Regions:
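Short structured motifs
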Residues: 54, 162-167, 221-224
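N-terminal mature ectodomain segment of secretory-pathway/periplasmic proteins
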Residues: 32-33, 38-40, 45-129
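Gly/Pro-enriched, hydrophobic low-complexity segments
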Residues: 175-274
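N- or domain-start disorder-to-order transition segments that initiate the globular core
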Residues: 25-28
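Bacterial N-terminal signal peptides that target proteins for export
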Residues: 1-7
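Bacterial signal peptide processing site
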Residues: 20-22
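Flexible, processing/modification-adjacent segments and terminal tails
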Residues: 40-42, 118, 122-190, 212-215, ...
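C-terminal motif of bacterial Sec signal peptides marking the signal peptidase cleavage site
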Residues: 15-18
Length: 276
């Protein structure tokens, strides 16, 4: 009997020790997680980080490998580009098969494909490669822009980004935190500027202002977005933009629309698709 009780006591003490070790490990893990929190530049940086906790991070996109979706770009005159977009997130590989191209290289008649393989940009019409420098310049801009607009919210934590918190403002009865974004560029090259309007209730960017310095667009353009949840990632599947001022007032009620649908992640895309 004595030995039985002794064994029970030993088992009880062992279980307490195990629980204590488990608790210690839990505390240690929590502490490690706290240490791994980003070091924020300022409040603006922290707000952008909180936004990515809602939308998903770029690592979440990398985990999903790749994507295929149907994309429409429509200008106020109702002319459209309609394409099947395919991306591999690791390396930002990009490919577009155009069902219609009334805005992008409309002078090139026939079935158009564009691609970026991680090194080179290319374009083909009816299977024939086009090497004209102006066409390649157009494709370079389109491939980069299409990929960036799709993944922008996740990429706002990329390196070489500067954040500035500008305070709060009310737009159409909604309170927003405003964060200015600029980018570190090579040499003395001018940076695009983004001004995010972050909803403090949802932590999402409802709209933003942007410039496109490479196209000499230095006056702000206002972009408004609507999100869709696809496999746990919040994506801005409807976007529209128009001319604005730096107070986000619409200067011209004529909008360019961008519509993303039929989104499919993890399609096991072959990298050969992205080569010319």
């Amino acid at each position: 009997m004595y030995y039985s009780k002794l064994i029970l006591v030993i088992i009880f003490i062992t279980s307490l020790t195990a629980c204590g070790n488990k608790e210690a490990k839990t505390k240690e893990t929590t502490k490690t997680a706290e240490v791994q929190m980003p070091e924020f530049q300022n409040k603006g940086h922290e707000l952008v980080y909180k936004m990515t906790q809602e939308t998903g991070s770029y690592q979440d996109l990398l985990n999903l490998k790749d994507i295929v979706f149907h994309y429409t770009y429509r200008t106020p005159d109702q002319k459209e580009d309609v394409s099947i977009e395919s991306y591999i997130f690791n390396g930002e590989l990009s490919h577009g098969t155009y069902l219609k191209h009334e805005r992008t290289l409309p002078n090139l008649k026939g079935k158009m494909q564009q691609g970026y393989n991680g090194k080179d940009f290319w374009v083909k019409i009816d299977g024939q490669e086009i090497t004209d420098s102006s066409a390649i310049e157009s494709v370079t801009f389109t491939r980069k822009t299409n990929f960036y607009w799709f993944s922008m919210m996740q990429k706002l934590l990329d390196p070489n980004i500067n954040y500035e918190y500008l305070g709060q403002d009310t737009i159409k009865g909604k309170l927003y935190d405003i964060v200015k974004i600029t980018f570190n560029t090579a040499g003395d090259a001018a940076s695009d500027t983004y001004q995010l309007y972050i909803n403090p209730e949802t932590h999402l960017v409802d709209q933003f202002l942007f410039t496109v310095v490479s196209k000499n667009v230095t006056d702000p353009v206002l972009m408004r977005v609507k999100y869709e949840n696809v496999e746990g990632i919040l994506l801005p599947t409807y976007r529209k933009y128009t001319r604005s001022d730096w107070e986000a007032n619409v200067l011209k009620d004529a909008w360019v629309e961008e519509i993303t649908k039929d989104i499919k992640f993890n399609q096991n895309l072959d990298k050969a698709l992205f080569n010319n």
